[in-house]
Regions:
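Glycine-rich phosphate-binding active-site loops on the catalytic face of alpha/beta enzymes
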Residues: 35-42, 75-87, 122-148
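Structural motif corresponding to alpha-helix initiation and N-cap regions
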Residues: 17, 37-40, 59-60, 90-93, ...
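Catalytic cores of alpha/beta
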Residues: 14-29, 43, 58-70, 102-103, ...
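Single conserved hydrophobic/aromatic residue that forms the stacking wall/gate
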Residues: 1-5, 9-10
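Glycine/Thr-rich beta-alpha phosphate-binding loop at enzyme active sites
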Residues: 26-33, 56-101, 140, 144
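Expand to "…catalyze enediolate/carbanion chemistry for C-C bond making/breaking, isomerization
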Residues: 142-143, 154-156
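Structural detector of well-ordered beta-strand residues that form the stable sheet scaffold
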Residues: 15, 32, 52-54, 75, ...
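Short acidic, glycine/proline-enriched helix-loop-strand junctions
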Residues: 49-51, 105, 156
Length: 156
């Protein structure tokens, strides 16, 4: 299992969520931080220029500030109601689209995305999606992943 994990981390980028210290300790490829976590500017100072920094944003102002402070990509959401983060408020699709037009870094939509609703994000300008339940809550994870990937590839 350790060998498989090591090979996967060499082949694929490994981003730690919300834990800059851990990302630094294990030399992860990067870290994703939320608005209540450390500022992107401070994360960049700790991890260096070669690491990937993602920042959650719900508003155009947050997105622009994250980009200015060195974020490499944005996670914007929740774009739909989600059971994974019950306290998450939905980001209007018009705000998502505006964020996509205002920043020059990739925007990843997150929150409540399923194979059934992902096409509603078409034309928003997103570069990808992040999901949990759309894959892991399914009986056949491999098939669910392939179907969702196909839907996303058709739109972005």
């Amino acid at each position: 299992l350790r060998l498989v994990g090591s090979e996967m981390c060499i082949r694929d980028r490994f981003i730690i969520n919300d834990n800059v210290k851990l990302a630094k300790e294990i030399d992860a490829d990067g870290v994703h931080v939320g608005q209540s976590d450390m500022e992107a500017l401070d994360v960049r100072a700790q991890l260096g220029e070669d690491k990937i920094i993602g920042v959650s944003a719900r508003t155009v102002e947050q997105a622009l500030l994250a980009e200015k402070h060195g974020a490499d990509y944005l996670g914007v959401g929740a774009v739909f109601q989600t059971g994974t983060k019950t306290d998450a408020r939905e980001v209007e699709h018009s705000v998502l689209k505006e964020i996509c037009t205002k920043v020059d870094i990739p925007v990843v939509a997150i929150g409540g995305i399923t194979q059934d609703n992902v096409k509603e994000l078409s034309g928003s300008g997103i570069n990808g999606v992040a999901v949990i339940s759309a894959i892991f809550a399914q009986k056949d994870i491999e098939t669910a992943t392939a179907k969702l990937k196909s839907c996303v590839e058709q739109m972005v």
